[in-house]
Design a protein with these regions (language model features):
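Beta-propeller domains with acidic blade repeats across secreted/periplasmic ectodomains
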Residues: 1-177
Length: 177
């Protein structure tokens, strides 16, 4: 049987958790100003099986529920993937697999949400980053999402995700594979 144990650290609002590289990685989205949004690493520094050290590897500006989300292990087990929604500002990155000349690329004139929801959110929107285990090098893996919360790799190492989109939005998405 499994048991649940409270981790004795002062971190809130973890939307994603991953155990890798002898550490617990957290994708944290700040809802209440207690814990900064970003990628965290929790480790056991004295060998007592208790996570006692909290490191904010990268602070990421995010707001609302479309912020920093899941953390996934790469198929080769050498890096992390951080999933972020469209209320997350792009963080500094060292490289990109996709073009970074962000644009709206709408086929028809822009039609912002009539109710005012996220009218100011433009491309690149949500981004999937590939990140080294120390959180120093961020590479844009894919971007253009609205509110992706998680992703998964298949047996061939292909990444799949689902975008929680505004079902009544008639514009084309920002997707960039």
């Amino acid at each position: 049987p499994s048991s649940i144990e409270r981790v004795p650290v002062d971190v809130e609002a973890a939307n994603g958790m991953l155990w890798a590289f002898d550490a617990l990685y957290l994708g944290v989205n700040n809802y209440n100003d207690h814990t900064k949004s970003g990628l965290y690493r929790l480790t056991d520094t004295i060998g007592d099986d208790q996570l006692d050290k909290v490191e904010l590897l990268r602070q990421i500006s995010a707001r609302g529920d479309h912020g920093v989300h899941a953390v996934r292990l790469s198929p080769d087990g050498k890096s992390l993937f951080l999933i972020t929604g469209n209320n997350t500002e792009p963080t500094e990155f060292s490289d990109s697999r996709v073009n970074t000349n962000w644009g709206e690329d709408h086929l028809l004139p822009r039609m912002p949400d009539g109710r005012g929801h996220n009218r100011d959110r433009l491309a690149p929107a949500g981004i999937i980053y590939q990140v080294d285990p120390d959180g120093q090098n961020f590479e844009v893996y894919s971007h253009g999402y609205r509110n992706i919360f998680d992703a998964a790799f298949n047996a061939d190492g292909e990444l799949f995700t689902y975008d929680a989109d505004m079902e009544y939005d008639f514009n084309t998405p920002w997707y960039r594979p």
